[in-house]
Regions:
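Walker A/P-loop NTP-binding motif
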Residues: 328-329, 349-362, 382-386
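Acidic, Mg2+-coordinating catalytic module of metal-dependent nucleases/exonucleases
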Residues: 122-142, 161-237
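A substrate-engagement module of RecA-like helicase motors
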Residues: 275-287, 294-298, 303-308, 370-502
Length: 541
């Protein structure tokens, strides 16, 4: 993916495979936040953070409260106080927060501090990162109990829903991703940081599709999920803007999962699929394959060769060249090869280069199966993009590749549609009633911002929204009978794309399941490289 300097910071924090238009959307949020007006979400806001002696709601107590009144993005007033917890602060907590027993010795008690906080807050809307934690500690005593009646907005929910393609939604990572003031894990510093990213989060919600924001706004009543109020207010803003632009009351459409998937693959958002970029012929055992000469492979691993040019610190390794030539020989003679190589040899590039060159020149497909999904992701998101770029620059060809994992790694659109129809419920998690609304909202937003990537990086609490309710199995899949079959389906859409790819990367589990299913699960593939083969036996079905 080509990125300019404007996108570099955000790009470093998005998950691998994030579509270019989504990266651009994220990169524009800071600028949008500077000029937008978010109405009631931007006025009479108090951003709050607390520090405590630990994370136990029953045993631990407050050590610091910090709050800032926010008016249209500007801090107008501060409230900061240490709190005497009535017990020693553990050393590890002091090390984390830089708050010591001497700091709190003469501080107000939790009840006194929360009374002062309540007077400062008044009827303002409260914003906190992981709001349930702060809300519990400031309202569990008589001094702050009245703050239960205020509207609480969880900025962590907003981040996970509006920015699902970020690698992390911790406050410190949001600060870095959007170049906001840096948090030092003191409550006042964290409040300042949250003040800096709060409007960016509102911009991110505003940038979501109108019908999705509207649907999320109605997922749960405010008493079950108070952060839903943000989506209700922004949905109203979006309707108002649409009406203003149209000159009359804008027509609203019900949320459609199918329409959302089609939009993701619209010409404006979607680069040409692999089928238009690659020429992979129908597979046949009689189809001749053309591979490079051994001398070409050897030259590629020289400092100024195809592989050598990929790395600034490249050092030729004899073992890597020997392995690459042996892989080439095995391909050329259609024989099996077992290779054992030590750490640091560069095994993956030693088999990827001859695989890529052979697949490109022959219009065929070569597969790679890894033991772990971590290695699979490294190959697909790190090594193959580098190889694709250098092969294109050298005029060798446009290498296409696809990763395929098992059904359980991808959301099933049919099951997601059932979730959409059923709406959010309250579920009991470790003795607490929790709404499914934020999890459903994050799932739908991820689907909207994703082409065919797996959901392994999606931050969902599967105790709230079980994974089996989102994913399917080969037995459960309705295949052509499913209304989402084809390009809208993560699994079958990705499989269709794989049919035109030069290199197919999968894991041992799916590779051996495909063998057992006599090739039903994966597209026909002429040659296979089984990496980490010493662990293959454990994956046999």
């Amino acid at each position: 993916m080509q990125i300019d300097d404007q996108h570099t910071s955000v790009y470093d924090f998005v998950t691998d495979g994030t579509p270019a238009d989504v990266v651009a959307r994220y990169a524009s949020l800071k600028t949008q936040a500077l000029h937008a007006d978010y109405g009631d979400l931007d006025r009479n806001i108090v951003v709050i953070d607390t520090e405590t002696t630990g994370v136990s709601e029953r045993k631990d107590e407050l050590t610091q409260i910090a709050a800032a009144r926010l008016e249209r993005g500007e801090i107008t007033e501060w409230f900061v106080t240490f709190v005497n917890p009535g017990k020693p602060i553990p050393d590890e907590i002091s090390h984390l927060t830089n708050i010591f027993d001497t700091d709190v010795a003469d501080a107000p008690t939790p009840v006194e501090a929360c009374e002062q906080l309540a007077r400062f807050v008044g009827d303002a809307t409260l914003v906190a990162h992981n709001a349930a934690f702060d809300r519990h500690f400031v309202t569990k005593n008589a001094g702050g109990a009245c703050l239960k009646e205020n509207l609480w907005i969880d900025s962590l929910d907003l981040a996970r829903i509006a920015l699902p393609r970020l690698k992390s939604h911790r406050l410190i990572d949001l600060v870095h991703a959007f170049d906001a003031p840096i948090s030092t894990h003191r409550a006042d510093a964290d409040v300042e940081a949250l003040c800096a990213v709060y409007r960016i989060l509102l911009a991110a919600v505003s940038d979501m599709p109108n019908d999705l924001v509207e649907y999320i706004s109605k997922l749960a009543p405010i008493e079950e999920w108070s952060t839903g109020a943000v989506f209700a207010l922004i949905a109203a803003q979006q309707r108002e803007h649409a009406t203003s632009a149209a000159g009359e009351k804008a027509e609203t459409f019900p949320f459609s999962l199918s329409a959302m998937r089609r939009s993701r693959f619209s010409q404006a958002n979607q680069p040409k699929p692999a089928s238009e970029n690659a020429s992979v012929n129908e597979q046949s055992e009689d189809l001749p394959m053309e591979f490079p000469a051994a001398e070409e492979i050897e030259a590629a691993f020289s400092p100024d060769g195809l592989v050598g040019s990929l790395y600034n610190d490249f050092e030729p390794r004899d073992e890597q060249v020997v392995m690459a030539k042996e892989v080439l020989k095995a391909f050329s003679t259609s024989t099996n090869l077992v290779v054992e190589a030590g750490t640091g040899v560069g095994k993956s590039m030693a088999y990827l280069l001859p695989s890529a060159l052979g697949a490109l020149r022959s219009g065929s497909r070569i597969g790679v199966a890894t033991k772990t999904n971590a290695l699979l992701d490294q190959i697909v998101y790190k090594e193959l993009p580098l190889l694709k770029s250098t092969l294109a620059e050298a005029g060798v060809g446009d290498l296409s590749y696809v990763a395929l994992k098992g059904f359980s790694h991808y959301p099933c659109m049919r099951k997601v549609s059932h979730i959409v129809s059923d709406g959010a419920r309250m579920v009991n998690v470790t003795g607490k009633d929790v709404s499914q609304a934020p999890s459903i909202a994050a799932l739908l937003s991820y689907v909207e911002q994703t082409e065919y990537d797996d959901m392994d990086g999606l931050k969902l609490d599967y105790r709230v929204l079980p994974r089996y309710a989102i994913t399917t199995t080969s037995r459960e899949c309705l295949k052509r009978k499913c209304p989402f079959f084809g390009s809208q389906c993560f699994v079958h859409g990705l499989r269709k794309r794989a049919e035109s790819a030069n290199v197919l990367v999968t894991n041992h589990s799916l590779f051996f399941c495909d063998l057992a299913a006599e090739g039903f699960l994966l597209p026909p593939t002429r040659y296979w490289v089984v990496d980490e083969a010493h662990g293959a036996e454990a994956r046999l079905p």
